[in-house]
Amino acid sequence: MTGRARARARGRARGQETAQLVGSTASQQPGYIQPRPQPPPAEGELFGRGRQRGTAGGTAKSQGLQISAGFQELSLAERGGRRRDFHDLGVNTRQNLDHVKESKTGSSGIIVRLSTNHFRLTSRPQWALYQYHIDYNPLMEARRLRSALLFQHEDLIGKCHAFDGTILFLPKRLQQKVTEVFSKTRNGEDVRITITLTNELPPTSPTCLQFYNIIFRRLLKIMNLQQIGRNYYNPNDPIDIPSHRLVIWPGFTTSILQYENSIMLCTDVSHKVLRSETVLDFMFNFYHQTEEHKFQEQVSKELIGLVVLTKYNNKTYRVDDIDWDQNPKSTFKKADGSEVSFLEYYRKQYNQEITDLKQPVLVSQPKRRRGPGGTLPGPAMLIPELCYLTGLTDKMRNDFNVMKDLAVHTRLTPEQRQREVGRLIDYIHKNDNVQRELRDWGLSFDSNLLSFSGRILQTEKIHQGGKTFDYNPQFADWSKETRGAPLISVKPLDNWLLIYTRRNYEAANSLIQNLFKVTPAMGMQMRKAIMIEVDDRTEAYLRVLQQKVTADTQIVVCLLSSNRKDKYDAIKKYLCTDCPTPSQCVVARTLGKQQTVMAIATKIALQMNCKMGGELWRVDIPLKLVMIVGIDCYHDMTAGRRSIAGFVASINEGMTRWFSRCIFQDRGQELVDGLKVCLQAALRAWNSCNEYMPSRIIVYRDGVGDGQLKTLVNYEVPQFLDCLKSIGRGYNPRLTVIVVKKRVNTRFFAQSGGRLQNPLPGTVIDVEVTRPEWYDFFIVSQAVRSGSVSPTHYNVIYDNSGLKPDHIQRLTYKLCHIYYNWPGVIRVPAPCQYAHKLAFLVGQSIHREPNLSLSNRLYYL
């Protein structure tokens, strides 16, 4: 592949008639119809320069079957089936929150000028979208035939239209409410087509929002961007990193939504990381690294759960299984009933020659059903030789050089990000075909980033032991300020084990010596560990643990020669379930650098203290009698994508002690079941610690997938309310439930001296880019050393507390300061990160519920 080509636009920007902002009134109605248009009417110029790298025949049309979408029937990604509502349209939670109906904005903090990656959508005056229902007599089943028959009358409906086989959208109103026309099939059969006007839709209707997004996807296709998942990428402008066998496709995320005062396009830079090796290449390499009789089992563990890209159609699939009984010569039944081999199918359909005839077949299960209440289509059967691995392995993520070389291209500064986003908007304004499409629909986009004002909250004071510290808000960490200061609460280290291998004896002694140096300043009393040498085998570690760990053992430290997952998992599983004891695993090489060994020993000592029940630092929290709950989910790929929900709750006023439980859920289920059990246990733990009950409970719910908000409101919140009613007569605490979302495409830039910079930590945004039907806000809480900072979105879906928006926002920011694995401000409230760590440990390593005797400790850090 060649290096990255420079983008070039042709054509002149066309003048626009006087336009009005779309969505300047924020009236939304629940429920909408999903419009599904035809493909773009014409090809535009390439977005980016350079020759196309698709294979010959790669754009061939399917003859009744698309193998990558299952074998039973054709599946069209843009127009097929009923889509999940990823943006939770129609979920209006603010209407039930009386105290924020009039205003949901706060006022505390210093005003700061910001801009964001949003562009207003404008339309010509009195714009409307006209929706028609199309009937055929006699009935025509095939959607393509329906389209061909209708489009014989483009002189009536015009060339600008969107049609899904039943519903037609036009930018104009036909003369008659009901119009009848006649068409002929190729066989000469007469067909009567009845076109009935069913809706005249205003610009802000939910149906129009869906329509805008589909039209915008059409524009991206005109610019020759390829859809992969939900985003669009430019395969003709690749960034090649040959030293690591990686390729990056640059692209964009896009969505058009109703925000506070207008409908806007939100677009951000996205990068798709591909590997230069196919799945078959990976299997061959892996075969030479493993024992032959274990190959199938081991390679399945490596591949299942990974996402692959099929370049012949630029689609991605998750590998759910490997069918070792099939190979390219195996046959399957096509939609027309005929049988064909994989070999022949790929040759005819995509001009792809398969060379290895003994390779197995990858299986990818579909996620979406066909239509409302429909059945799942058959699995996609994929050939390893034609599938490219995407993303990074754990080994790559831990390789400093790989991540550094990737970051050069993917970690963009605010100004670089604005420039790339601006490049897309420039193309939209300069591409003749794109402008023609927009002009026909009567739509256009602003050229400039949206600007508005945000607020910077007051910097928090950190209390550690008897001392109080300020920190530099620009860096948002206090590792230097608190070094050498006593902790809030310490546990004496009297009875502990240090297990090491012979070659790590020096590192083990060095660790103990440095722990003796750093612990006195923390206030920790420490005795020398019981040191035990073991062979560097998993079984040897387990045997020593079984023989040496007793009820009096406070903590076990294992010094490991490498970060081998199987060894780590076995140690954690035994000490978290069979023999509940806090544990700390340390890779020996991290102790090898003399210049950092003291800092690492300090961090290890802090973690050990936390895991034994100690407390490090706190911030001022004016709210009293309040329990904070954090919930997050992890999908365990090794157990059929079973989900684990981590549940963490504060059990003291200072929010320095935490109770934890986890819940196992069915395959792919995101929303938590069994919340009652967790909350009841947490309230018992609170009562045991304080001898009274909390009067407020504030839940931060992370790990909610796009489109699941309605289920959360209707299903999970009632579980909390039912649980509180069951505690006892007369107990009626105030409840607040806040959905936390890290994966957002919104970016904010601070304007300083004519340059764009990252906003300072503590920046709150609750205007312009929030949703009118929600009680929501953004906070930029952390600082980043390079690239662009990502905000976190908070959506208060239930609240009978009566707390002001300022109080909720400031509490949320305070909670980002008390995560004990990092002496600084993190991106989400600490209970969310604790819940994530718990769910991750259980899903990655333990695969069972941890022993309940560990519930009151941060053993999962």
Curated annotation (Swiss-Prot):
Cellular component GO terms, alphabetical: chromatoid body; cytoplasm; dense body; nucleus; P granule
Name of the protein in its database record: Piwi-like protein 1
Residues recorded with modification Symmetric dimethylarginine: 14, 53
Record localization: Cytoplasm
Organism: Homo sapiens (Human)
Protein keywords: Cytoplasm, Developmental protein, Differentiation, Disease variant, Endonuclease, Hydrolase, Magnesium, Meiosis, Metal-binding, Methylation, Nuclease, RNA-binding, RNA-mediated gene silencing, Spermatogenesis, Translation regulation, Ubl conjugation
Span of the signal peptide: none
Region (Required for binding 2'-O-methylated 3'-end of piRNAs): 316-318
Motif (D-box): 217-224
SUPFAM superfamilies: PAZ domain, Ribonuclease H-like
Names of the cofactor(s): Mg(2+)
Biological-process GO terms, alphabetical: meiotic cell cycle; piRNA processing; piRNA-mediated gene silencing by mRNA destabilization; primary piRNA processing; regulation of translation; regulatory ncRNA-mediated gene silencing; sperm DNA condensation; spermatid development
Disease named in the record: Defects in PIWIL1 may be a cause of a disorder resulting in the absence of sperm (azoospermia) in the semen, leading to male infertility. Male sterility can be caused by defects in ubiquitination and degradation during late spermatogenesis.
Subunit structure: Interacts (via Piwi domain) with DICER1, suggesting that it forms ribonucleoprotein RISC complexes; this interaction is regulated by HSP90AB1 activity. Interacts with MAEL, KIF17, PABPC1, PRMT5 and WDR77. Interacts (when methylated on arginine residues) with TDRD1, TDRKH/TDRD2, RNF17/TDRD4, TDRD6, TDRD7 and TDRD9. Interacts with CLOCK. Interacts with MOV10L1. Interacts with ANAPC10; interaction oly takes place following piRNA-binding. Interacts with RNF8; leading to sequester RNF8 in the cytoplasm. Interacts with TEX19.
Annotated EC: 3.1.26.-
One MF term in the entry's GO annotations: metal ion binding
